[in-house]
Curated annotation (Swiss-Prot):
Keywords: Cytoplasm, Elongation factor, GTP-binding, Hydrolase, Magnesium, Metal-binding, Nucleotide-binding, Protein biosynthesis
Protein name: Elongation factor Tu
Binding, Mg(2+): T26
Subunit (UniProt): Monomer.
Source organism of the structure: Burkholderia vietnamiensis (strain G4 / LMG 22486)
Region (G3): 81-84
Positions of GTP binding: 19-26, 81-85, 136-139
CDD domains: EF_Tu, EFTU_II, EFTU_III
Length: 396
């Protein structure tokens, strides 16, 4: 059977299920594919197909993740589901599966549990912009007041972590009933309500090409008679010949002009997100630009040294450290294309961090890096990765 061509007729959105163990994330994932396939076509996935999530590697870290896709009336969704709590932590911190929105699954029978809280906190730290709640197992709760209480608890928890708890859509249902083909309010109807909430509450994400121009510097060459060429892959936006751009990071920010764009030895009038290009810079010396800097639209990104981050520390089995680290630990932080040394300050209540832990830290780098919240990095010691992290808040 020939592979079907991917029809990009509908806007594409990335989502995922989060929540406490055994609250029904995987059952819900199976139910969504089953119900939406009946209505909009596609391929249904059974529970055990999703549960047997294959291993992947992201930044050298092994993560089990299941990927499914489904359609609604006006969108195409890619959806990730992880079997274990540790997989969620790694997935969200490494950005292996960037989410435009998350579906928080919470059992109406149990209410919010420790991982419910932890996943909401992680979503906040790593910059998941929207959360929709699916209150699962509602068929097991006869008391309407109890349901109301659980809903209130979930809303309060969301508000506590700076999500708009009062305005968050909460869909009540039973993933199990929906999966079994029950057409009632808690069954297939609830799944359609959830699909509707996804379509209306999560805005269509900005495409990479529509963002402000940014290109990490990978290499710098000097071409006699023409000037300095910087190569790299455009991360977002478009750069046109003749436009002003800034060189940001490591050293003080300088402005220059793009006088040429080439790809595969051909001259172009612009380079855009996804392109591997060489950019010719006017009046810039070879020694003015180095790996680790970025070329960017003027004013769109600034250099920083001091920030808070959420990090995952690799376990010994993953090739990480064998021993814990303590306050003022000084590893290298690998941002985009280069390492910068920095020191780590642990939270007051944390004396040390063990391999396999995730923790919120404060970092001070010895040189500034073009940075924004949500930027991913690796933590390295002498070239080997010992952790992964994401910038949560910029301090200065």
């Amino acid at each position: 059977m020939a592979k079907e061509k991917f029809e990009r007729t509908k806007p594409h959105v990335n989502v995922g299920t989060i929540g406490h163990v055994d609250h029904g994330k995987t059952t819900l994932t199976a139910a969504i594919t089953t119900v939406l396939t009946k209505k909009f076509g596609g391929e249904a996935k059974a529970y055990d197909q999703i549960d047997a999530a294959p291993e992947e590697k992201a930044r050298g870290i092994t993560i089990n993740t299941a990927h499914v896709e489904y359609e609604t009336a006006n969108r195409h969704y890619a959806h990730v589901d992880c079997p274990g709590h540790a997989d969620y932590v790694k997935n969200m911190i490494t950005g292996a599966a960037q989410m435009d929105g998350a579906i928080l699954v919470c059992s109406a029978a149990d209410g919010p549990m420790p991982q419910t809280r932890e996943h909401i906190l992680l979503a906040r730290q790593v910059g998941v912009p929207y959360i929709i709640v699916f209150l699962n197992k509602c068929d097991m709760v006869d008391d309407a007041e109890l349901l109301e209480l659980v809903e209130m608890e979930v809303r309060e928890l969301l508000s506590k972590y700076d999500f708009p708890g009062d305005d968050t859509p909460i869909v009540k249902g039973s993933a199990k009933l929906a999966l079994e083909g029950d057409t009632g309010e808690l069954g297939e109807v609830a799944i359609m309500n959830l699909a509707d909430a996804l379509d209306t509450y999560i805005p269509t994400p900005e495409r990479a090409v529509d963002g402000a121009f940014l290109m990490p510097v990978e290499d710098v060459f000097s071409i006699s008679g023409r000037g300095t060429v910087v190569t790299g892959r455009v991360e977002r936006g478009i750069v046109k010949v003749g436009e002003e751009i800034e060189i940001v990071g490591i050293k003080p920010t300088v402005k220059t002009t793009c006088t040429g764009v080439e790809m595969f030895r051909k001259l172009l009038d612009q380079g855009q997100a996804g392109d591997n290009v060489g950019i010719l810079l006017r009046g810039t010396k070879r020694e003015d630009v180095e790996r680790g800097q970025v070329l960017a639209k003027p004013g769109s990104i600034t250099p920083h040294t001091h920030f808070t981050a959420e990090v995952y520390v690799l376990s010994k089995d993953e090739g990480g450290r064998h021993t814990p680290f303590f306050n003022n630990y000084r590893p290298q932080f690998y941002f985009r294309t280069t390492d910068v040394t920095g020191s780590i300050e642990l939270p007051k209540d944390k004396e040390m961090v063990m391999p396999g832990d995730n923790v919120s830290i404060t970092v001070k780098l010895i040189a500034p890096i073009a940075m924004e919240e949500g930027l991913r990095f690796a933590i390295r010691e002498g070239g080997r990765t010992v952790g992964a992290g994401v910038v949560a808040k910029i301090i200065e």
